[in-house]
Design a protein with these regions (language model features):
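Residue-level signal for glycine
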Residues: 182-183, 187, 479
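Beta-strand signatures of extracellular beta-sandwich domains
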Residues: 174-176
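A short beta-strand element within beta-rich, extracytoplasmic domains
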Residues: 80-90, 108, 142-146, 155-171
């Protein structure tokens, strides 16, 4: 049985383990797109023909793949921008800096950290710093330097800031223009006083005139798209035994009961998925020799027959909800890459196998960097997608995805903001390496929110398409315990396959 543990890290992470049982509804918070671990606090393709899906509870069966991803290359992006640098430091115990969201910020990148902040947060429109009160009393300084890529139209009005801090000492904001090796100070603001009308947060609003940047031409960079084709994927769970379906904890069941090691059942699932425009399964994987590993081998062989793609969802967490240690992660990834990279059905991006990482933020980014460097040194390179919308992860990983988006407020705007920050991340790197933006869609989660006869699923698809994603992930094909499945079922028939096909045609037909 499968259990999940929910904790909040920057934006809440849905922690998965490799045993099986239903779980509580998670809480996600996505008001800010974080770039570093959060914690700073304040006091208070044109598709081919596809098989017809019926409107009954009987799932469609087709013997050949009928919906393949477009092979039309996506065009590169040519981007003009100005590079703005913010040096932000404090000798107080806490401070936050918010930028006006009306400013068209394309992306942001952490450059340096100074001192020893106990927590810090770096986002496209929000910075924050914390240090112990004892350090502040001793006058110690902590800070971050962050670069921003601004659209040229951002220069038409002053850039507005709101600076807050604790009662101790002060904070300093330096705004600079970066052109090649030339760094020029535009404005410096020091906030040292206690605001008597609001001494708890001591707010200071100020603005910076950027019109002087118009005297120089914006930088211009061409960014290639990270993938050559749009692909629609579904998270897939190969852990079911025949007797699982008798559990009273299930809210719904497949029309035909199955075991995850049944060849006929897997083939039927692939055919159903293809008829709905799905190009591949992201198969939950719990390590060498596990039941999910045994079934992965079978899934790959059957997928090859159907020209269907497969990759793994690397389960970073143990059954306890705690992350695996570095040595185990290294061992598992080494096995997965060396064992499966040669399989024709295993997805590859520019020749490198694709690995999707679950709960990546449960392991420090520095640890991931070390793991991936060791694997590359062994000749075991891959394309890795991190979990969550922590943009700083793109210094190590090749793209971002989220598993559960069911409770993210303002999903359309969140997708657009994260897509922009991900797609343009290379603007601020030494070389403009393209990063993969994945939008997630899902029909619901457990009892919340209400599926509303497919309306919720449609709404997440609409939000995803507006962000122009490289790929779309569906949560899920068959996670029955959490009631996120779109696989044909007793309650819904093939409704969700028909909705999936509708949006797949709309998206790939662009």
């Amino acid at each position: 049985m499968k259990s999940r543990v929910y904790i909040v890290l920057t934006i809440s992470l849905l922690f998965v383990s490799c045993t099986s049982a239903p779980s509580a509804t998670p809480t996600l918070v996505a008001d800010v797109i974080p770039l570093t671990p959060a914690g700073a606090t304040v006091p208070d393709n044109t598709p081919t023909a596809i098989a017809t899906l019926t409107n009954t509870a009987t799932p469609t069966n087709t013997s050949t793949p009928t919906f393949l991803p477009t092979n039309t290359p996506l065009p590169p992006l040519t981007v003009s921008f100005y590079r703005l640098r913010i040096e932000y430091s404090t000798t107080s115990d806490w401070t936050t800096l918010d930028l006006d969201k009306a400013t068209n910020i394309l992306t942001a990148r952490l450059i340096t950290i100074s001192g020893n902040p106990s927590n810090f947060e770096v986002g496209a429109y929000h910075l924050a710093l914390n240090q112990p009160i004892s350090a502040a009393q001793a006058g110690q300084s902590v800070g971050v330097t962050v670069d921003y890529a601004l659209s040229p139209n951002s220069l038409n009005q002053p850039l507005a800031f709101l600076l807050k801090k604790g009662a101790l000492n002060g904070s300093v904001v330096r705004v600079l223009n970066v052109t090649g090796n030339n760094v020029q100070l535009i404005q410096e603001v020091k906030h040292q006083v206690v605001v008597e009308s609001n001494p708890d947060i001591n707010p200071l609003a100020f603005s910076v005139d950027l019109s002087s940047l118009k005297s120089t031409s914006p930088l211009q960079v061409q960014i290639e798209r990270p993938t050559s084709q749009r692909m629609l994927w579904a998270f897939y769970y190969p852990w079911y035994y025949a007797d699982d379906w008798s559990s009273t904890q299930l809210k719904d069941r497949p029309i035909t009961r199955y075991s995850s090691d049944d060849r006929r059942a897997i083939t039927h699932q692939i055919e159903q998925a293809q008829s709905a425009g799905i190009d591949g399964f992201i198969s939950s994987w719990c390590g060498p020799g596990d039941y999910t590993d045994q079934n992965l081998k079978l899934l790959l062989d059957l997928a090859q027959e159907k020209r269907f793609s497969v990759t793994i969802y690397f389960e970073t967490l143990k059954d306890s909800g705690r992350p695996r240690d570095k040595d185990e992660i290294l061992k598992w990834l080494s096995y997965a890459i060396s064992t499966y990279r040669g399989h024709p059905a295993f997805m590859k991006v520019n020749g490198k196998p694709l690995i999707v990482i679950w709960a990546s933020e449960s392991v420090p980014l520095a640890t991931w960097k070390s793991i991936l460097e060791e694997l590359r040194a062994q000749g075991l390179d891959a394309t890795y997608l991190a979990t969550g919308y922590n943009i700083t992860n793109l210094d190590v990983f090749d793209g971002l995805h989220e598993y559960n988006v069911s409770t993210i407020p303002n999903l359309t705007e969140t997708f657009r903001s994260v897509a922009r920050a991900t797609r343009y991340y290379g603007l601020l790197a030494d070389s403009p390496t393209p990063k993969i933006w994945v939008a997630t869609v899902q029909p619901g989660f457990g009892e919340f929110p209400d599926r509303d006869n497919g309306k919720f699923y449609r709404n997440t698809f609409e939000a995803a398409l507006k962000s122009d994603p490289d790929w779309i992930f569906i949560t899920t094909w068959n996670e029955w315990w959490e009631h996120t499945h779109i696989e044909p079922s007793e309650l819904y028939g093939d409704l969700y396959l028909r909705i999936t096909r509708e949006f797949a045609e709309k998206w790939k037909g662009k």
